[in-house]
Amino acid sequence: MSSGSFATFCVRTANPVAEENPHHARVEVRSVAGDPVGLENTGFDGMVFRAGESYRFSMWARSVSGDAMPVRVALADDDGEPLADAELSVAGESWAKYETTLSVPFPTAADDEPTDGEARGIVSTQGTLRVLFREAGVVDVDFVSCEPMTAYKGLEHFRPDLVRALDELHPRFMRFPGGCITHGLGLDNMYRWERTIGPVEHRPHNFNVWGYHQSFRIGFYEYFRLCETISAKPLPVLPAGVSCQNTSQGPVPIADEDMPGYIDSVIGLIDFCNADPETNAWAAKRAAMGHPEPFGLEYLGIGNEDRIDPVFEDRFRRIYDAVRAAHPEITIVGTVGPDPSGRDYDEGWRIARELRIPIVDEHSYRSPSWWFHHLDHYDHADRNGSRIYLGEYGSRDTRLVNGLAEAAVMGRMEANGDVVTMASYAPLFCKNGHNSWDPDLIYFDNERAYRTYNYWVQRMFATTTADTAWPVAVDGGILFRRELPRTVGLSVTGGASADLADIVVTTDTGERVELPDIAYRGNGPVTTGLALEADSYTVDMTVTYHEGMWGVQVHTGDVNGPDHNVASFGRSFELQLVREGCGSTLAGTEVSMDMVRPGTVWHARIHVADRGADMALEIDGQPIVAGREVADEPRRTVSVARDSAGGVTYLRVVNAMADPVSVDLSQVLDALDVPVSSRAAATATVLTADDPYAGVHGEEAPTRPVERPCELMSGMYEAPAWSFTVIAVG
């Protein structure tokens, strides 16, 4: 605002554009001397503007007096200098939508400037959108929008580079809108699909359980359009009539009297996707949004990681029965809780068997060590029961070793394709600086997308899909045994508040160390400075719990290194192994839905033996949980897949060890009758790096897959250290 100009600003709710989102801005411009006054927005972490790009601007506005109000809309660069502007005139006392186009010129004229918005040069990374008023008057403003007009395959409202990164994975399906945001933080926060379609102004904003704001500019209609654009079958997930249990209020069910209306909403989604607009009101809404053709919905998820209790079972059964009766052609995907074991898992599978649910959604976030130890997890699945959809999985980091672990387990899932019918990595996208969960498959900032090692592994499978697969028994040095450190330290982390007193560490040689009390207030790692060496030891302490639902974690062993141990106190007791910087549960009790009472006291003893391979926990002198780590991890795997239609055989080789290894594939090639000519012309796509711990959250993977000739006349293939290889023969 220049000297002599004067204006005021306030937020109002009276007479809004949309009652669903009533808050809007009122700007009272008293006087303008020199430069105009107005509103500006720097976006999320600044706005990136690109040379040669055009931006679609829109806003709703009204002149309170009814007199015409001249408005200048401008894009400004990092220094506040204008890049593009346009003039509008707001006239009339009623709300109206005003639109214009803002075009950022190229610095110099050229005939060969790029036309792909992803390739255009960035001229501003901390840009600003300005709505400027040039005369005195009073104006109301709402729903201001500014989007680049470049679209990937014509898909509006999505960043082209992000959609491209997703499309290049060649996904067969996409699950949305996510996990815990589906059932929400209480009933008012439960994701209601029908509130995310239609005019965007009438989609009520909300928050989600991860703390993000949801404007629903991307709603269910846009998700279906995204799936259509990338040729992925949609898999929408709706709440099972119960909110998320991982909150202070626990799971809250939809009231019994409201369930018929909710079931109608679930069936309405199927109609919105598939019904005829001429005969169905929901389908007419789809047509009104510009898509009279059906979306061809085949799958519908009901529930996400829910607490499987009698209330959940009642709500789920009612939804399931109603959908099956109304739309038997829809394949319903059920849920069996957040982990691949435990009470919810067992109860979820019981319900699946009783109802004969076609597919159940399992979730599993585990360390690379856990995955390598459990490559046979699906070998023993019931072939006569529900099919398995591994709907959320990952290995808790973006390093190469994590990608290799995921490649190994994906090979085994592929070999168990008769029962593991679907799988999807999660989470998918994360904006740098705004992460509530790591790792993610694709990170991005305002300028570009970053593909992780996990991404490249997914892509190597997605571009070599097959219809038949077999595991291969591998002889020789496939086992990895970890050398655990003798270091004994102690630190505390967690999200709760607790006092830890009377802390005594006693080693197997009789050395005894008393540590100062710790008043922990959820304030990040608190270290004690303990530095001993021992193979076995005990830790005694008195834990007084004050508040917090996520517990307090006591780390022991080499707490500053990648391999140590954790004992967790809270709504459950849990022992964890941290290996290569990633943790997984060794043993634990069921998580209680009740909060820990403030002032609860536990007299705890943690037993650690064999340098952390063996753990046990006592509370008040009673054994609670215990477990022992299996020493050997299968770190070298081979699997075979066949694309019958394409006539191509894929040999997948994982070598997650520090030395290259020669793999004799001759028996496999002979068994598949691969001709000599095909063996001579094979190609290998190899993902590898010297450092297994290369790869950082939020950054591009340091290396990416490389394709090269692979002559297999002898049947021998040398797999590089720390590598995943897909050999194509055909």
Range-by-range predicted roles:
Residues L226, D321-R324, P328-T331, W349-E354, ...:
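Catalytic-core region of carbohydrate-active enzymes that cleave or remodel glycosidic bonds
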Residues D35-V37, F44-E168:
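Extended acidic/polar, glycine-enriched regions
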Residues I122-R217, F224-K233:
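An acidic-aromatic substrate-binding cleft motif
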Residues E87, P634-V676, A684, T725:
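Carbohydrate-binding surface patches
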